[in-house]
């Protein structure tokens, strides 16, 4: 009797710990509402705690690559803001799916998961599906990078089979600040690691699209871009008025050259948008000047896919499928005004100052721009390159006074843009593209990525794209539909039975789970009730249209109310309910014999278990 009671008491004490300790299986996405017919792509999603005292958790959504080319690669994708969700990238840009409507997904022809594992992360804490107590939002870029290292350490503990992949960090807009800081933090972490006990992470490259990297070059470019695109006529009375604002901006930059945000410079963009409205009070879309929008939104209602993304991600079925923690009490919002207004980076230097050392350390960097974006336009990016010194030269110098040529890129017979390269830095200008290049040109953007990662498809097959620079046909990359090739399709079929049973295993410990299942369920309810008591308060945010352009950007589409404390709208979630489709789960391209021999993939069973957007 006493022994039985003691045993029960022991299990009750340790059960919360067992329940709180997660494995890869707890993150496995077994079904995804609205997914296309056929086997479901291999994916994991959920939260990882990065700040226990303040209930800080980052949300991730991971897709395993469809095919392995010559080596294993992982691309980490971040959107900007700060405070804008990387689900923008997942569902509107580079992810394998896009939304046809509020309930239905379709394949994205040109998704970046063809030859790379994709890891989307909502960060900093409080962004998208991530959460934290509202008095604990981050302020500085080094704080953000430190938390991201904590996230990666824990993520690789859950998924050790990816830890020796070649790592590329990609993103757009304000992620142009985040990415170099994270890269520097990874290098600092690697210096302290004993490779015998913990792996050094193979950081290979950074990919930044329409990046907010160098405010000192980006702010003055607004007016030059307006002249170049014909939004404002040079020498006109409007141009003279705007010159006054430009002069104030330039003086502020001279006084504070290391500032990340300068409100007086944002007035230039505000004036361009407000003073170029048409007779219907429609302003230019700051993300794509080929379009117009109602004032003062000026692009906040873009892109059109957003009308489906928000209700889809707020659907109960999707929230359940993506393993969202009960602690996340508010529905998904694209951008958090609370996060953006707190993340001032007042004591941080612009990330452009980190680029030379990263380039000189051997990290390759790709900067790309859509030519129709105003807010983070290509003129500013080109100016930062021209003024930057690294690896013994300035800008795209190949030798003193000689600059690398701007080479013309064609894709499937059509002009696609410009390529330029020197000393580990590549620049690509996309023609007829917006702030979100992969949204407009998914296949061209994937072609760019594959070339930058030096993908070799010799062992894969498939139909390569006709991609040329200055008329010279480039090495073959395949950017066709899904599956990539008949060989890969056959390989997938052979893998189905092998991997199906593993989808529900838990790090090879299924038998143990059966034994302790009853105890852990009991412990889960105890743990859950404790965690729920660690809630957080809300912070009221400004209405759209108030404040500076960047403040509006950070408050973008986050709703008129509080984004961090607002409960789910029960009736809305019921209306948006879409039946979850149970699908066959499988992975493509697991064979270790296709890996780089210098980067063997561990056989850990856990892999199979489970301001600017």
Curated annotation (Swiss-Prot):
Catalytic activity line of the entry: Preferential release of a C-terminal arginine or lysine residue
Domain of life per record: Eukaryota
Topology in membrane: Single-pass type I membrane protein
UniProt-annotated stretches for the region Disordered: 463-490, 559-613
Keywords: Apoptosis, Carboxypeptidase, Glycoprotein, Golgi apparatus, Hydrolase, Membrane, Protease, Signal, Transmembrane, Transmembrane helix
Record-annotated membrane-spanning stretches: 507-527
Biased composition regions of type Polar residues, renumbered to the chain: 475-489
Biological processes per GO annotation: apoptotic process; proteolysis
Enzyme Commission number(s): 3.4.16.6
This protein's GO CC annotations: membrane; trans-Golgi network
InterPro entries, per database record: AB_hydrolase_fold, Peptidase_S10, Ser_caboxypep_ser_AS
Active-site residues annotated for this sequence: 173, 373, 435
Acidic residues: bias regions: 564-573
Example of a GO MF term: serine-type carboxypeptidase activity
Lumenal side: 20-506
Enzyme class: hydrolase
Entry annotated with the keyword Acyltransferase: no
Family designation: Belongs to the peptidase S10 family.
Function (record text): Protease with a carboxypeptidase B-like function involved in the C-terminal processing of the lysine and arginine residues from protein precursors. Promotes cell fusion and is involved in the programmed cell death.
Protein name, entry field: Pheromone-processing carboxypeptidase kex1
Protein source organism: Aspergillus clavatus (strain ATCC 1007 / CBS 513.65 / DSM 816 / NCTC 3887 / NRRL 1 / QM 1276 / 107)
